[in-house]
Amino acid sequence: MSESQASAQENLYFDVVIVGAGSGGVAVSSSLLKRNGNLRIALVDPATKHYYQPGWTMVGGGVFSAKSTERKTHTLLDKRVSQIHQLVSKVEPDANSVSLQDGSVVSYDQLVMSPGLTLNWSAIEGLEETLGKNGVTSNYRYDLAPYTWELVQKTKHGKAIFTQPPMPIKCAGAPQKALYLSADHWLKNQCLDNIDIEFCNAGGVLFGVPAYVSGLQSYMDKYGVSLSYNHNLIKIDGETKKAWFNLTDAEGNKSEICKDFDMLHVCPVQQPPSFISESGLSDQAGWLSVDPFSLQHTQYENIWGLGDVMNTTNAKTMAAVRKQVPVVAKNIISARAGEAPSAKYDGYGSCPLTVERGKIILAEFCYGGRVAPSFPNWLNVGTKPTKLAWWLKSVALPFVYWNMMLKGRELMTNCPEEKA
């Protein structure tokens, strides 16, 4: 179809329907066509623009321009993929169909659910009204990451608060990445001593994989950061520059405290799209219920999960998606051939923690928090800050994303297969 687009004004049938044009959706469409070029594939998403979201941390740190993280969606899709510019209202798994918001229906043989998660900005009272002004920002939005960098450059003294909500969130390290790059700038511009930095984390640990905590803690100490655990942001008054937190003490008692700020970087509350549970596809928490290894739905054998929407315990990162894509693609090809899924995802995720401009602690791990480095120690020690990891984040990974991953060129993505 022209310009990789399709009209959904009538009932349509495809071999594979993919919900979501994010990293997973675009990449798996390409990977499937690499394996079977005759597949009829539809990608359901109204988005005309696609973003390299891992780059927004670098935008907020003054390393990337926002524009460099953006492409037009249709330019990334294989011409054999039909994009349907509609939102999903509900999946009818027993009918093998997807109902769209314009009332039309798309039928499928295999369905890939990769709609991502929902950023609930309204969950924090007063946040929406003050975002992008009054010193309140977030690297979790394309249009706000440049404001983060603007604030970092303008802030010479005062109070800077960085927040992290309850898990799960996209890239659990992102809230502290913003902190590190900001603090590094202030240190190098001789104003860090005049800025009181506080990291307010709704959780109880600095990072979920113990092997990396020591290295990260050393940077928190270097920058003089006050670590406030079990502090959950609930309300903001941008005009008076006050933020309220729910604090849970060691005995489980809750109290509310107010903090003044000059700069506030907020990580929003994150949740699954509502249509997942409304379609009967979710677990009790609302996330897509899948087998953690095959990524096949726990009830419907022709439905597959990919990316942030799943209830798997891996880190919700682009690196995880890069490893998940070939698993889903291989297993769909097997399913269409009447075979059981054999490709397995091991829970791999990666979080390049930008502890300073020019150095990164490259956290890589699988299910259970098992450290899973991609490189030998003589080349890169993942638990320590290295220049190589910075080069990967700032140069190599964006290139791999745009020119390989989204095009179905699978680099370092070998997935184990179950032996017969």
Protein language model features and the residues they cover:
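Beta1-alpha1 glycine-rich phosphate/pyrophosphate-binding loop at the start
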Residues: 2-82, 166-210, 415
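C-terminal auxiliary extensions adjacent to catalytic cores
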Residues: 12, 362-420
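FAD-binding beta-loop-beta segment adjacent to the flavin cofactor pocket
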Residues: 286-304, 355-375
